[in-house]
């Protein structure tokens, strides 16, 4: 009898949620406990599923700290999700209006020198098409900074969009309160929406893998496969940045 041991956190919050979810899934399948480092958004450092196992019992670690874990056991996923939710510090977020929209645009380090070549962000036309195809009341935009050129371009097109650079916790609460969400690319939205009691509709690019398929949620996919191929590998060149904000491919004129 052992403890599943997350020795360290890898990357950002979205990745950390994946690490913990994977560790819990393994622990539930084996009736083990979970040891993890302190984290601002997790209320526990020890998850006890088996009282016969102590914190000083044998520890099982993973070279990837359970971020990349293949062949996860097929078990009661609802139990895994409930344990995960119990660990998260932000709870009971009130829903936004059903006709409001929250857009998350990934920015940050992928717009610096030597970015990850696989992190290709959707173009401006992706967001504009979604807005034009619907009649949303209030549109909220979430981003960590304004390095992604789509952010300022979208704000220029739609000055009434609600946007401010704010602490991560406020962004999380907006995401968890959202009924309608637009995802860009990365693990943050998929991971955070595991904790949502309000989400009904998720817009996402076709080349973005659905990490966790949520029940009773409508997924609306925009075909951006050709765009993705034309932008690979991502180098953050001026040509690529210009292509991101080119509106020649709009579906809804």
Where are these predicted regions, by residue range?
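A structural signal for short, well-ordered beta-strand segments and their strand-loop junctions
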Residues: 5-6, 33-38, 102-104, 140-142, ...
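A short, glycine/small-residue-rich beta-strand->loop->alpha-helix junction that serves as a flexible
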Residues: 8-18, 112, 118-121
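Secretory-pathway luminal glycosyltransferase catalytic domains
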Residues: 3, 34, 38-137, 149, ...
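Short, flexible loop/turn elements at secondary-structure junctions
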Residues: 10, 107-109, 143-146
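Donor-binding and catalytic core of enzymes assembling or modifying cell-surface/extracellular glycoconjugates
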Residues: 136-221
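Non-transmembrane alpha-helical segments in soluble domains
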Residues: 24, 128-131, 152, 193
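Catalytic phosphate/metal-binding cores of nucleic-acid and nucleotide-processing enzymes, i.e., regions
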Residues: 18, 23-30, 38, 95-99, ...
């Amino acid at each position: 009898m052992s403890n599943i041991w997350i020795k360290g956190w890898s990357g950002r919050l979205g990745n950390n949620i994946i690490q913990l979810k994977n560790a819990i899934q393994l622990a539930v399948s084996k009736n083990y406990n979970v040891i993890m480092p302190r984290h601002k958004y997790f209320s526990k450092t020890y998850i006890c599923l088996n009282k016969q196992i102590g914190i000083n019992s044998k520890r099982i670690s993973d070279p990837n700290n359970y971020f990349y874990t293949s062949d996860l056991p097929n078990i009661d996923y609802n139990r895994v999700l409930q344990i995960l939710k119990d660990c998260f510090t932000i709870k009971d977020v009130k829903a936004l209006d059903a006709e409001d929209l929250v857009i998350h645009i990934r920015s940050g380090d992928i717009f610096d020198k030597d970015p990850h070549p696989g992190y290709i962000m959707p173009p401006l036309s992706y967001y504009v098409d979604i807005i034009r195809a619907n009649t949303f009341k209030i549109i909220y935009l979430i981003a960590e900074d304004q390095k992604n050129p789509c952010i300022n371009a979208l704000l220029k097109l739609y000055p009434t969009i609600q946007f401010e650079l704010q602490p991560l916790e406020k962004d999380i609460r907006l995401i968890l309160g959202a009924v309608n969400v637009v995802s860009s690319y990365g693990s943050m939205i998929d991971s955070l929406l595991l904790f949502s009691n309000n989400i009904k509709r998720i817009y996402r690019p076709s080349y973005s893998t659905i990490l966790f398929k949520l029940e009773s949620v409508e997924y609306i996919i925009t075909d951006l496969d050709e765009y993705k191929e034309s932008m690979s590998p991502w180098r953050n060149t001026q040509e690529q940045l210009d292509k991101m904000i080119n509106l020649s491919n709009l579906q809804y004129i």
